[in-house]
């Protein structure tokens, strides 16, 4: 089997180590309304279209109960849209600072292109958000061949439509000749739903939730334990392979191409 293309996620996978840009904004918009949410809660829906992310947070039982305690009713669609508008406003001001390619990404992408592979991408950000991120990432040396956002299709993750549109624009078929690489549960579901080889990257991921400094200075045993939790979570949600860093991707490609794996 010949792999012809790789579809990467953005924040937490190729840029923004740890996926911190949206995290603090989600926490802030709820805190402003007297509802405290944890980092873990804020990260759980990561990878979804951002308004869907806000909606998913309001549907978490603990958060919904806390909201009802504060306001006397459960969150409404009007509440969700109000928070999302505020989320967008804040996020736009900080996005340029969270578009730095993660170490190793540019080198791996260059190597993949030398092998003749095409590079696509999907995201949970809107097109307007990605106009900012993609422009800054390109200045810093990272530019995929194709970028598809939820605005470009009928629905974002976990639906496979962004991957299908990548396939069409890249001119690659069948889908099992492509790999989806991401750092969230929704990435794994997106890739599997699209019938692609699906790979979860652990270090720098939203699922791990550590800054580069925290990962480098953490006790190695503790870090390994946290990474194993993320690895299992990826596999439980459909990952065919997991890699610690992007540098492990080419080994995955070689494994797929040398053996007759069947996507199940």
Curated annotation (Swiss-Prot):
Gene Ontology cellular component terms for the protein in this record: cytosol
Organism phylogeny: Bacteria, Bacillati, Bacillota, Bacilli, Bacillales
Protein name per its UniProtKB record: Phosphonoacetaldehyde hydrolase
BP terms from Gene Ontology: DNA repair; organic phosphonate catabolic process
Pfam assignment, any one: HAD_2
Matches recorded under NCBIfam families: HAD-SF-IA-v1 (TIGR01549), phosphonatase (TIGR01422)
Enzyme Commission number(s): 3.11.1.1
Molecular functions per Gene Ontology: magnesium ion binding; phosphoglycolate phosphatase activity; phosphonoacetaldehyde hydrolase activity
Family note: Belongs to the HAD-like hydrolase superfamily. PhnX family.
């Amino acid at each position: 089997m010949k792999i012809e293309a790789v579809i990467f996620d953005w924040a937490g996978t190729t840029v923004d180590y740890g996926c911190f840009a949206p995290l603090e904004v989600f926490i802030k918009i709820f805190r402003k309304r007297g509802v405290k949410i944890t980092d873990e809660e804020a990260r759980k829906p990561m990878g979804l279209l951002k308004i869907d992310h806000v909606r998913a947070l309001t549907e978490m039982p603990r958060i919904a109960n806390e909201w009802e305690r504060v306001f006397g009713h459960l969150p409404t669609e009007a509440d969700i849209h109000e928070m999302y508008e505020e989320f967008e406003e804040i996020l736009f001001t900080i996005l340029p600072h969270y578009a730095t390619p993660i170490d190793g990404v540019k080198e791996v992408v260059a190597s993949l292109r030398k092998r003749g592979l095409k590079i696509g991408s999907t995201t949970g950000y809107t097109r307007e958000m990605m106009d900012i991120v993609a422009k800054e990432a390109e200045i810093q040396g990272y530019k995929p061949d194709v970028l598809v956002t939820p605005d470009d299709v009928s629905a974002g993750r976990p639906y496979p439509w962004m991957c299908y549109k990548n396939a069409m624009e890249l001119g690659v078929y069948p889908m099992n000749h492509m790999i989806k690489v991401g750092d969230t549960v929704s990435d794994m579901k997106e890739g599997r739903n699209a019938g692609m080889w699906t790979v979860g990257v652990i270090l720098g991921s939203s699922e791990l939730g550590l800054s580069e400094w925290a990962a480098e200075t953490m006790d190695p045993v503790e870090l390994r334990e946290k990474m194993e939790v993320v690895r299992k979570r990826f596999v439980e949600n459909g990952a065919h392979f997991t890699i610690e860093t992007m540098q492990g991707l080419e080994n995955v490609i070689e494994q797929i191409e040398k053996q007759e794996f069947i996507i199940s």
